[in-house]
Amino acid sequence: MPVPAAAQLGPDGSTITSSDYAIDLSRGVVIGTSRVTGLSGAATALAEGVEGGLQNPSAVAYRGPQWPDWYDYWLALGTTYPFKTGDFYNSGRVVGDSGRLANDSIFFLIPGAYFQMWNLGVGLTIDAQFVKIEGAIDPVTMERDTLRLRFTVFHIQAGYGFLDGQLIIGGGLRILRQRTYLSSRLPSEGDSYKTLGLGAELGVMFKPHHKAWSLGASLFPELSTGVRERQDGSQTSDGDIVVGDFYVPRSTRIPTVGSVGFSYQFGLRPSNPPWVSAEQLAARDLERLDHRKRAAEEDERDEIARVRARGGPEVEICIQAVKQTYARRYAEIKRSRKELKNLAWEMLRREYRQGWPRRYYLLSADLQINGRVDNAVGVESFIFQTVQRSGERVTVSPRIGFETEVWPQRMKLRGGSYLEPSRFAESELRIHGTFGLDIKLFKWNVFGLWPDDYRWQLTGAVDFARDYGAFSLGIGGWY
C-alpha cells in the first residue's frame, strides 16, 4: 500500500510538522580521544592506534617502535563530556528554550580495538553520541518522559604499510545507527524508531623514515541512514513518524568530510623511526642457528643411513637412539632461538623506553572540509522541533596543534586552536582553544594480557569556546 506524501519542511523558525527532513550530524567541535582533542583535531598526519582511527583510517596499520613483536594490539576507551552546552552546535541559540538542553544532555563514548600482524592492521572503533531531552510526552501513558537519541558509528577498518611502513593506506566500512526511544533510564527497553546506514572511509599517511615531517589525508564520503530497522512510533495519515510529541526525521546524515594534515617534529628524539621486529634485530644469530639445524638434520640422515647399512638385529633400536640424540640438539637450538628473540625484544624495548632522548616539540596542522547536506536541520532543531536548516554550505575548519614531553618520563603537554565554522546561516564561526596532558602512572600487566613492563597513563583534555566547554578522559599505555 503506498504511503501518502508527507508534508514539506517549513521555513526557518516554523514548527516541525513533518518527517520529510534529515538530521545533519556534522560536528563542528572536535570530538575524539584526549590526544586528538588536545591537538585541536590536527592529527590527520599523526594518526596512530585506536585514538587516531577516527581522524585517519590508515592509523590501523601504523606500527610504532614500542612493540617489537610480529604482532601488536591496541585497546582504548575515551569519553568526552560537554560540561557547558549553552550552544553546543554553534547554532546561535535561535530556536527553542536553551534550558531544555541541560549540561548533561550530551555525552560521547569512544571504545576501540586494533590488531596488527607485521604491516597489516585490522580494527573496530565505535563512536557513540548520546542525547537526552527531558519532558517529552509518552503517547501510551500521556506522561512526561525522557526522549533519548543514540547516534552510533561503527568504524570497521583495515590497512597496510607499504615501503617498509613509510606509506600507510587504510580504509573500511562505516555503519551509522540511529536509535530513538522514550525512557527515563539509559538502557533501552525497546526502540521506538531505529534506522541504519552504510558508508566507506579512506585514509593515507606518508611518514618517511628519519624525516622530521609527515603528511596525511582522509576522506569520509557522505553517510545516510536509509534502512529502517524498526518503527514502533505512530505514523500519521501523511506518512510522518511521531515518537511522543516529536516528528522523527526519515534519515540522519553525516556529510562528506575530507582532511589533509602536516606535522613537523623538532628536538633530539628520533622522528618517524622504522618499526624493527625482534627477529630482524637478531636475524644474523637466528640464521646461524638455522644453519646449525640444517647441518644437524644432514648429520642425522647420514648417521641413520650408516646404521641401516650395518644392519643387525638391533638396527631399529640404534636408529631410535640416534633420533633421540638429535632431538635433544633440536630442542637446544629451539631454546636458543627463543632466548635470542627474547633478548632482542628486551633490547629494543629498553632502547625505546630508556635510550632515546625524550625531549621533542611537535607541530601539526590540519584543514578539514565538511560538505553540504540537503533538506536537513541540526540536532538542536530536532530537539526543539523548530526548523533551522543546517548544512546548506560547505564549511572549512583550519586546525593547529602542539605537543611536547615537558617532564621527561613523567608528563606530556599539548595544546592547540581551531576555527569552528557554523553550519547555520544565523550563526558565525567561533575560535576554540584546547589543552591536554598525559600523566605516567604505574606498571600492570593486567593478569598477563600485557608485558610485565607495560606502564599505564592517564590522558585528559579540555576544549573551550564561546558558549561551549568540554573535557575528555582516557587511559592507555605510556611510551
What do these predicted regions represent?
Residues 3-7:
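Sec/Tat signal peptide C-region and signal peptidase I cleavage site
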Residues 9-479:
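Subset of outer-membrane beta-barrel
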